[in-house]
Amino acid sequence: LMPDQMILQIHESIGHPLELDRILGDERNYAGTSFVKASDFGSLQYGSKLLNVTFDPTIPEELASYRFDDDGTPAYKEFLIREGLLLRPLGGALSQFRSGLEGVANSRACGWNRPPIDRMANLNIEPGDQSLEQMIGGIESGILMATNRSWSIDDARNKFQFGCEWGQLIEEGELKGVVKNPNYRGISEQFWRNLSAVGDASTFKVLGTPNCGKGEPNQVIRVGHASPACVFSQIDVFGGDA
């Protein structure tokens, strides 16, 4: 998956399920729940050992950068997932108090007339050590996908199906013919545990979305995501007629 598709994968299957207010049930009647439980932090192997996910509002060029969140908490880079192990949630001061868990500075409001709630900010996958050429060269049979076209995920942010605009066959370590309408599906934990290669800094792109919605009344904010290209093994892929 190329970075412009990875940002959706991060957003939907890491970002939303790790929001602590959602885990505590606050979004149940609007946007759903989370397959993650409060007791999972510090023990759940969320992905393979190649998965390192950081919350970092201090990066100037990303969409959701700040020095303090809207509760006045200083913002720092924090690992949410290190070597695949789930460490901490996306939870601000109030959710931390309610749960007893250590979170991050992510209480954000879209305006003066909305309360701060737990939101993503800059949520990134840390680069690995392989170039795009090395990753492609290590794949016997697969497909390169880029540019999101469609998305569907259940209200616990667990089972998902995503489609891409661009697909290109990989055979014996080489890019081959183009396919159309490639899709893939999976279950969040299983999917991230099948992460088998992470691109280096040369594949890393800073992207994001300006319109992530959450809360009642609704709040729309900017969210930053940065990611290298990533390889996943044993994924259910369908569509993609040549």
Task: Explain the meaning of each model-derived region.
Residues L1-A242:
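N-terminal small-residue-enriched
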